[in-house]
Amino acid sequence: GCIKIPIRPLFLISSRKGLHRMKQSLDFPKPRLCPVTKVLYLYDIKFIYMSAKIHFRDYNPKQTVLFPQRLDKDIAGNDPVRVVDTVIDNLRLEQFHKLYKERGRSPYHPKMMLKAVIYGYMNNLYSCRKIESALKRDIHFIWLAGYERPDFNTINRFRNRVKEEINHIFTLLVIMLAEKGFITLDVEYIDCTKIESKANRYTFVWRKSTEKNRVKLMAKIKALLEQIDEAMAQENAQGDNGQNFTPSDLMAIADELNRSLREGPEPVTKEEKRHRKEKERQVKQLKEHAGKLDEYDEKLRILGDRNSYSKTDHDATFMRMKEDAMNNGQTKPGYNLQMGTENQFILDFGLFQSPGDPLTMITFFNSFAGRYHRLPDKAVADSGYGSEENYRFMEEAGIAAYVKYNWFHREQRMHYEPNPFSPQSLYYNAEGDYYVCPMGQHMERIGTARSKTENGYVTESARYKARRCEGCPLRGSCFKAKGDRIIEVNHRLDEYRRKARERLTSEEGIRHRGRRCIEPEAVFGQMKYDMAYKRFRHFGMDKVKMDFAFFAIAFNIKKMCSTMARRAINGGNCPKQNPITGIAIILYAKNQKNEGNSQNMAA
């Protein structure tokens, strides 16, 4: 007989060569393969179907052990969580103890809370609810917290409780990095970026609109008081223009009018009733104006020296962000983040409400001095900081300023040709204190122009005037104003720029200029895109500073871990100024101690 067997469930044989091999291996008679139906015919063969048995690894999630195992046995010895544990354990947190009460329920240990929050920030977990979830699910968080499980409210209260002391922890960490050779604190690369606030985008309050509406309201108040022909209204008026009225003055006038209406005789005639109703309407309108005036005064008080603020975050100022999807220059509420870095470690940071950079540099240097009781030897920044006030501060403080000015890059172009009619291109005689115009005429000094910055710094510019400019053949190219040409020159600023040009074009200056592009800019890129820190998550300047201080600590520890890992890959060959850190030695000793304890327990 003939047994009819399909190919697919038995063997995948696609050629006569495969059939021949099957015959030799199984000692089959010569089979016949139908070319049409692809069916294999075996004659006088009793075929046994054979299937391979799959063996899985043992799986028993309910398996118990005789001795409890260490939770960190599955955590690598060089894992960043161990670095966080070691760094926080070696920090002194005595200032945290005064934040807790002696009575009541025992709180969670501040070191455990600090480790959990910082490690959460290192893993892009900025929400207290996400950190709470990680403390229940992630083995790294569970080991770091020692099986403690604080809820999100407890984590949030801890962050708010230590919002003043967390800056001190950041300072201690940077000092430790300097002691271990990661940084030197001798050079600081400064730059800024705008970080959007948590406030909504369309909650703006503008100074110009507020002042304009307040002037209109004062005109309405003056017109209303002129309609009130009571003697006490004229006595309470503080000035003819009505600009000195306060909400309390208007409320006092309204109360006096109400009292006179109550104490007056009841109206009898229709005309008296109409007159009384008109007075009541005026009193009501006066109270409304008083409330509106109080609202405008409160807005101006919140504005301070700024031009805008957000209704939901009074400390946020509307600024133009780099992330402009519509490409229309739309302003959003945010903060100006100033940052100083070295070797891509954050040395110092500051949050400012002014969008401009020149006004923040001196305050930022004072913050550095307050943290480390010294100033950096060198400062590197872009042209946004190249003002006379900043140059003078750095020169008096003994800081070598590698700071660009406005047209530095334009001067460095290969085919740059200066304008022969600009004041910088004219010949200056320092002894006679005069300039020589392109036609050879002397431009004598006629006075000094003074201007004051928003910080109160006074700049002085010498004014020089030419003679007999009428009929000059170069007048059209020289200037277009009427009369003789007048120029203003800031000699002190020109001298600062000359020194900055010499530093920036030197060999060391070229090296610093090259590193500035990969120092703060790289930190901003890692912050916004690698760690997804593009927007603040709190309202108010104090909480925003607290949140970024936690982030800066987490960023520096994460950068330290990556630096240590890179050195380990390179075979431990470290530069002389960056020796093997003591943190790695501490971790190694700690791991050896833990392994010894576990071996003793097993024995």
Positions of PLM-derived features:
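Short hydrophobic targeting helices and cationic amphipathic motifs
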Residues: 12, 19-21, 28-29, 42, ...
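Short, positively charged and aromatic/hydrophobic N-terminal segments
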Residues: 27, 34, 41-49, 588, ...
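Hydrophobic alpha-helical membrane-insertion signals
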Residues: 45-82
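Basic, short loop/linker segments at the boundary and entry of helix-turn-helix/winged-helix-like folds
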Residues: 76-118
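Serine residues within intrinsically disordered or low-complexity segments
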Residues: 14-15, 25, 598
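Anion-binding and metal-coordination hotspots
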Residues: 52, 58, 117, 124-137, ...
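Extreme N-terminal basic, low-complexity initiation segments
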Residues: 2-7, 11
